[in-house]
Amino acid sequence: MSDIARTFRIEGVPPATGPWARAVEWNGMIFISGLRGIDPETGLPAGTTDQRLERILEHLSLTLEAHGSDLSSVVSTRVYVTDMNGLRPAVNAFYEKAFGEHLPTRTILEVSSLNQNDSIEIEFVAIRKKEPDL
């Protein structure tokens, strides 16, 4: 069995707001904890939905890079939104921009609330492409 590597801090990505790893890598798979659109300067959710999704994309890219991968290696996602009808179009546009022809699988769920009154949180699973920089 392969070793399990846990990442708790990634430069440029806000720290977790609780006791969990930012990412866990096992057997070439990268499991990334839910990312929200947190402004690293304030520690709070960014202003607009688009700004939150941009932050999620930035934090995802940094996390993948730290693990020797990139956006094209994302194979599965789970999206949590607090308003399906209002947020699904923005999430769809985000997916087209972020993943292009490399669309991962996706589950999208509406939830009653998220931490810090946020509106979107996304978990990711990716495949490692090369040895990580950890």
Regions found by a protein language model. Give the residues of each.
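N-terminal presequence-like segments and the immediate start of the first folded domain
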Residues: M1-E58, L62-V75, V81-L134
